[in-house]
Each structure stands twice: as C-alpha cells, then as structure tokens.
A protein has these predicted regions:
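One-carbon transfer enzymes
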Residues: 1-238
Length: 238
C-alpha cells in the first residue's frame, strides 16, 4: 500500500508509522504501508527534514505564501480546493497514493480532495471523539480533566468534508490522567502521545488498513473483519 503523509510540524507520528513499517518489512511476508511521499505546507519543518533524511520524497508548498499571493481568505472553501489541487498535483507526479495519512497537518482539507480520496484519508485526535464536551481550541487532555475524566483515549478516524470528525476507526487503551491538573497539559499530552498515539496510529495504518481488515459502508458504519463496530471503532489492546 502506497501512503502519502501530510504534516506541518515535528513529525512524531510520521516517525512512528515509518518505524513500524520498517519493522514489518524486515519481518517479510506481512502487509504494511510504504510511505511513498511526504507533503508539507510548512517548508523546512522538522517532520519534512526527517523524511528527507530518510530518503523519502518531500513535497512542499507554503500555504502562507500561496494564500498571500492570491490575496484570498485561506478558509474560503473554493480557495481551499485550489491549494489542495496544487498539493495533489505535486504528490501524484510522485505516486498515486492508496491512503493519505494526516500526521499533525495543520490545514483542514477541502471537499474536492476528500471526495476524490473518500475513505482514504485518516487523521488522529488525542482524545475520544465520541465525547459530547469537545470544543475547538482547548487541549483534549484539559477538556477531559474539566469533564471529571480519570483517563483519556485517542482516536484514529476518517476525514469527512464539513465535519470535525468522521467515523472512528480505532481507539487507544485508556491513558490514566490520575494526579494531573489542567496546568499539566504539556505533560499529559506527552503521555498521550507515547502511550496512545504512537501505538494506535501505526497499528491502524499497517495492521488494519494495509492489512485489508477495515471496511466502511455508505452509511459510515465501520467493519473489522466483516463485523460491524460500534461508534467508538476498534478498541486497541497493546
């Protein structure tokens, strides 16, 4: 399976996915996702530099300069599609990806790209997307503490146009928040990354998606090995 990774920052989830693919490839005979290209809207970001150092083709198109040159609002849906079309043109010269993985990509994708790659664009949220208390602009860990939660799960999900979250594919094991307070957001987020994100994202991409075990019907119901899952998706156990 050919994968294009979109990123904007340090690329820690990209690294986790790459390392697991390398491990699986070394074992031989197991299906895995090969990262064929990395795209970034922030040229020179740490994740892009990591990918280049690994010999992976890196494609960069500054979203800041793109929208500035057009003199248009970067959140305008039409202009969003212009940018996405330019990004896809660059990527598809390198490969025709079977899957697009958003790994800390800080731009919302438009309807054109998501329609063209329907059910083939995945993202990760460092919290439980089924919770009804989630708001934008506040760390998931802080929201969990405010809601009285003693633990948190992170979620791999499918991207959908005009929706914050599409259907959940996989959730991590609960990550304990015992002893943490709101002001400990940075420490909580690091814990969630190490005990949640870096475990389930590689597992979802390689073992479940590349392994051909996940399916989605027209009503956005998710199936694992032909069995319909609940709204929380598959519950990962490491």
């Amino acid at each position: 399976m050919r994968v294009a990774v979109f990123l904007s920052g340090s690329g820690t989830n990209f690294t986790a996915i790459y390392e697991e693919g390398k491990r699986l490839a070394g074992m031989g005979g197991k299906p895995y996702a090969a990262i064929a290209a990395v795209f970034t809207n922030v040229p020179g970001c740490k994740g892009a530099l990591k990918a280049a150092g690994l010999g992976i083709p890196v494609l960069a198109l500054s979203s800041k300069l793109f929208f500035s040159a057009l003199g248009r609002d970067p959140d305008d849906d039409e202009v969003r599609d212009y940018y996405d079309a330019a990004a896809l043109a660059m990527i598809e010269e390198i490969c025709k990806p079977d899957l697009i993985v958003l790994a800390g990509y800080r731009r919302r994708l438009g309807g054109m790209l998501l329609g063209r790659y329907r059910n083939r664009v995945v993202n990760l949220y460092p919290g439980d997307i089924t919770k009804d208390y989630l708001v934008r602009g506040v760390d998931a860990s802080v929201q969990a503490i405010r809601a009285g939660e003693s633990s948190i799960k992170c979620t791999v999900y499918l991207e959908r146009p005009h929706e914050r979250f599409g259907p959940a594919l996989v959730q991590s094991e609960p990550v304990s928040l015992d002893g943490y307070k709101e002001e400990d957001a940075e420490a909580m987020n690091e814990l969630i990354r190490s005990e949640g994100e870096w475990r389930i994202y590689p597992y979802a991409v390689h073992n479940l998606i590349a392994g051909g075990r996940l399916g989605v019907d027209p009503d956005d119901n998710v199936y694992l090995d032909g069995k319909r899952l609940g709204k929380e998706g598959y519950q990962y156990v490491g």
